[in-house]
């Protein structure tokens, strides 16, 4: 009995140590404000960092992809004619995966700008318009397919009536995993075995446990807030966007707000040399915000 009690106490102490709250006041520098890097765009979206810490992002109305070079603090055009890329994420091999919704496609783009169309539809039907994507370490990808009908879509006819979350495995097989009101931002973590997804029109963000390749638990409500884009830091805090950037603890409690002087903040990611600079896409502009915390790998 004593041994069982000791084991139980050791387990409790271990759990408390692992659940110990982060000192959030030390996550961000006092008095530091986001810095606008450029405001020459129409609508910025989909930031994702490469292995060097440079951040690629889209200007969907102008059909371009740019990147922020952290060494020079300059924004450089990467690609014109992107299929109207929206959300992006680098895969394990360093290819930029884009949600190119002009024809309801997902693209794979190399650093030397060679394009491969990975996905055009589901079960023989055109996707509504892939919005955001997260690649896992197995070579698969989770992506959202809401419907935001664009002015530049020519002859569009909705063929899929649901708005859903999908998984495409490394062989190209696509599986519908769940359906939402309007799924949007998505981010995951191999380390935490978690996948987060925003149902923006429902005003909710959900979390799944990742159980295996394309296998998820039942979704659980994470917080009563929808989001356009999202990011995770190494502590498991989730960063949501809309009116600036809202930071939630891994337990779903709002702990911080970063104000951005734009009408809409679309997305956010970590980048820079040490993966500790928040790169924020907001309407016609992009911003950087140095922090004391690093993004999760």
Which role fits each region the language model picked out?
Residues 1-22:
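Bacterial Sec-dependent N-terminal signal peptides
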Residues 19-297:
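Sequence-structural signature of mature extracellular/luminal beta-sheet repeat domains
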């Amino acid at each position: 009995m004593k041994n069982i009690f000791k084991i139980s106490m050791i387990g409790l102490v271990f759990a408390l140590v692992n659940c110990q709250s982060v000192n959030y006041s030390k996550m961000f520098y006092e008095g530091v404000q986001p810095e606008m890097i450029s405001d020459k765009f129409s609508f910025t979206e989909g930031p994702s960092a490469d292995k060097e810490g440079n951040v690629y992002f889209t200007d969907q109305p102008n059909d371009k992809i740019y990147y922020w070079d952290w060494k020079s603090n300059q924004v450089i055009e990467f690609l014109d004619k992107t299929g109207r890329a929206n959300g992006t994420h680098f895969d394990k091999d360093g290819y930029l995966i884009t949600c190119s919704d002009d024809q309801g496609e997902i693209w794979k783009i190399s650093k030397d700008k060679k394009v491969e169309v990975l996905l055009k539809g589901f079960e023989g039907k055109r996707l509504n318009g892939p919005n955001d994507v997260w690649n896992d370490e197995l070579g698969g990808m989770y992506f959202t397919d809401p419907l935001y009908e664009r002015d530049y879509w020519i002859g569009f006819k909705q063929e899929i009536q649901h708005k859903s979350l999908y998984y495409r495995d490394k062989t190209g097989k696509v599986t519908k995993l769940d359906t939402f009101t309007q799924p949007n931002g998505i981010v995951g973590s191999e380390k935490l075995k978690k996948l987060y997804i925003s149902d923006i029109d429902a005003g909710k963000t959900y979390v799944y446990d990742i159980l295996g390749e394309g296998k998820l638990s039942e979704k659980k409500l994470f917080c009563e807030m929808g989001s356009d884009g999202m990011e995770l830091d190494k502590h498991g805090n989730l960063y949501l966007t809309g009116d600036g950037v809202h930071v939630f603890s891994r337990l779903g409690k709002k702990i911080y707000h970063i104000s951005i002087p734009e009408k809409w903040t679309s997305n956010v990611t970590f980048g820079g040399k040490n993966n500790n600079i928040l790169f924020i896409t907001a309407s016609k502009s992009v911003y950087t915000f140095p922090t004391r915390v690093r993004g999760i790998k």
